[in-house]
Structure formats: structure tokens, C-alpha cells
Amino acid sequence: MKNKFNFKIFTGNLAIIIYIALATTICHLIISENYGYFLDEMYTMACSQHLSLGFVDIPPVAPALLWLITTLFGNSLFVIHLLPALFSGAAVVVVGLMVKELGGGRLAMGLAALAAAFVPVWMAVGSLYTYDFLDQFIIMLLFYFLIKLIKSENNKLWLAIGAIAGIGLMTKPSMIFFIAGLALAVLVTKHRKMYATRWPWMGAGIALIIILPALIWQMGNGFPIVEYWGAYSAGKAVHASAVEFVLMQVVGMNVFLLPLWLMGLYYVLFDKEGKKYRLLGVTFAILFFVFLVTGAKMYMLIPAYAMLLAGGAIFVERFASKIIKKMLIAVYACLIMITGVIQAPNFMPILPVDSLVQYYDTIGGLFGTKSIRLDNNTQVELPQYFYDRLEWDVLVDDVTEVYNSLSGEERADTAIVTQNYGWAGAIDLFGADKGLPKATCGQLNYYFFSMEHIGRKTWITIGESQEEMQKVFDSVTAAKISRTVYRKPGETLILICRGPKFTVDEALQAIKKFE
């Protein structure tokens, strides 16, 4: 009997999901070498060279995966962006599979997958290697297994949910919000009876086992993660008003997807067929309220919309029996694609930088603001996720020039010091080929693996105040100002500091910056 290749995957109901997912991944790979390394990518690369279960802000999963792929294939921009591109396609597949589990057909799966491909936030995270692309995917996967749990009533699936939650916590700590939201939603719905079985608790036990080594490390080091998130909430994050938060949800999800996910929310809360999955809607409502009142970053809630897109697509499919309705749905799908393509340069490195500036002066203003608000008092011409990929070579070349101006004897006793992990990451990534020592940096995870040179007698500092350095060194010389066109702050002061007035222990205490 001859074995025949099964072409069903290319022609069956799942085919449309596969095609959209492949197109999503390919698009990300095509632009993967545009611009340069993002500062968080360079930081994660540095963390990947010092793998540890302990962390201040980045848990070990993202650095470990980056270590694996760069060890195998190098650290080119294409390689760095390979996993985000693949996971972007995988996220499209998960949304499509949610539809399948909810009972949707080919039209619903195609519509939901298409919508997922053009969610602006997912377009953005798919073009960067940060923990966000993993976090978004893992949360979607958690909700997918939650749908399977509700549908099958197989409580053993709590074990899978627990494992996913544990991996999620070791990817990004904000997973705790989704775990807590789900736990509360189970408690206030009919599914509370699940707590009378052993399976949710065994799932929680699996999650605890996964995070236990990191938890022990945190306890032994004074919980630096608590210090970090406290500082992050107090100063760095934009504190959006309730109106701003809601508007950012609409824009971040693509304005034209608003009716789709609203129908999805109605479907899982009130629809005769969909209310079986009310737990999904209640979980979403709890998360929405928590993030609303805390002024959270708008993208934190975005992965929870995956299940709403799935529900909305099923709701739409139900009314697509007649040709006219199918034509209207086709028009709606085209609108999603067109607006997604128009918005894409706002979230992906597609346009040349000069053209990008022109884009923000014209089309970009239709879908957001020309100046993107990052921190509480900062206005910029380009979004931070773009400008922090640019002109790192300028900074490293300027530091190299200052370093090479020293005598060989002094260079041997010189540290390059900064409290900005982006600058430190650039020195580590590009400086080795120029003969620079590894950077010394007190910010976040860098504090635990970059203190080797802190006792050296000459410091080249990046971005420090000359007046402040004069208080702690005998001699401070302004060596150079590094100037950039797009990357902020635009001018960065490079100092040569000689004769430290402090001990190594005092330096270790002063340089620590968990924010």
C-alpha cells in the first residue's frame, strides 16, 4: 500500500490559519535586518551570556532562548529576530485554534487569524527580541488551554495551565496578574466547583515548582524584583487616565477590530451558545478593571483580546449564510487588511528612517499621536521602540576614540561605566571588536554580572554629570559629546574620571540602580 502525503493541512479548514501565519512570519523576517539592535535586545543578549535563575527584571526564559539560538547561529539581526517572527506566526495559529475549539468554521478561523495578524501591538512585539513576544504568546496559549478545559470538562488540563503559568512567570513577572485574574474569575463563576478537585491545586503546584529556584534566589537577595517594579510603577511608566487607557486599547488593537472584539466579549458573556465560556469574559473584565485602575501599560492586556477575537469571529460567521452577508464580511476583512498595512510602519521597521519621520507627519497622525509619550515628562519625534534601534555605532565609536586617547598603561586600568543598560549593552555588543573592555553598569541585571572592573582607577563614564563626578574623583575631564540625530537624548557626555575618592564597597552601593 502506497503512502500518500496528506494535503489536508493545505486545503482543509486549518489551511487559512497556516497561510496567514506563514505570511506573518515571512513579513517579519523580510524586515528583520532593518534599522539596528534595540536597546532591550542588547541588554537581553548581555543577560544571555550570564544565565542565572536570579533576576531583577528579566527572568531567565528569554535570555536562555536567546543564548541557545545565538550559540547555534550567531547574533546577526536576522537570527535575533527569528524567534519573534516565528512566535508571531504561532500566535496567529493559536487564535485560529481558539476558534476551532469554540466551534467555529473556516470563515471564522480565517477572520480571527487575519485580525490577529494585524493587531498593532502584536506587529510591534514580533519585530523585537524582548520578553514581550514570549509573554504575549504564552498568555494566549494559557487562554487556549482554558477554552479546552471548559469545553472538555477535563480537569487534568489544569496541569498544562499550571505549567504554562509557571513558564510565563519565568518569562515576565506580569503573568501574575493573569493568574490572579483567572483564579478570581473561577471563584465568582459556576466553575468554582473546580476548586473542590485536586487538579487546580496540582496545577498551582507545578507552577510553584517551576518558579521555586528563582523565588529562593529572590528571598536570598532581598527581592530586587519588588524594588524594580515599585520604581517602575512610581516613575517610569506612563500613568494613563481611564479615558486614555480605553482609547489606547482601541488603538493598540486596531480601531477596525473594535466591533469584532466587542462582539466576542458579548459572545462569551451573554450569547446562548457562547456563555458556556463565560469564565473567559469574566476573566477579561477583571483584568480590564485592574489594569484600568492601576494605569498599566496599554499593551499588558492585549493578549487577553485573542479569545475575544475568536468569539467575535464565530459571532460574525453565524450571520454569514447569505451571499450578501458574506460580501459584507469580505469588505470588513479588506478594511482590516488595509488599515493594518497603513498602520504597519507605525509599529514595524518598514520605512527608511527619513521616510518614517515623514510618515509620522502625515499618515501616522491618523492612528495615534505624532509625539509618542514615553515617560512622565518626555516628548519625542519617533517612538522609543524605533529610535532606540538607531545610531548605537556612533556612541561606541565616540567611546572608542576617548578610550584610545589614553596611554596603554592607563587603558589597562580603565573601566567604562554607565548606569544605562542600553549604553552598556551597546559597548558589550560592538565594543569587543574595537578593543573596549566590557561595560560596568549598575542598572538591573547588569549589577550582578558587570562589576569586574569597578575597582579600576580610571573611569570613562557615559551620560554622567560632570559636577557629580567631580565630587567623587580627583580629576574629571569632559572628553567628548556624542551626538545623534534620532536617538535620544541627542547629546551624551563622555567623561574621563581619575583618582576615585571611594572604596569598591562604596562604589558597589552607589552604582546599584534597580529601576
Regions found by a protein language model. Name each.
Residues 21, 112-120, 165, 169, ...:
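Short helix- or helix-capping micro-motifs
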Residues 176-277, 341-349:
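Transmembrane-lumen/periplasm boundary regions of multi-pass, lipid-linked membrane glycan transferases
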Residues 31-44, 54-66, 74-78:
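Extracytoplasmic catalytic/substrate-binding loops of multi-pass membrane glycan-assembly enzymes
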Residues 121-135:
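Short acidic/glycine- and proline-prone juxtamembrane loop motifs at membrane-interface regions
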Residues 318-358:
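Signature aromatic-anchored transmembrane alpha helix within multi-pass, membrane-resident enzymes
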Residues 18, 82-103, 141, 145:
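Transmembrane-helix motifs of polytopic, lipid-linked glycan transferases
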Residues 107, 145-166, 197, 201, ...:
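Short hydrophobic alpha-helices at membrane interfaces in multi-pass membrane enzymes
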Residues 100-103, 142-157, 265-274:
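Membrane-interface transmembrane helices that cradle and orient dolichyl/undecaprenyl
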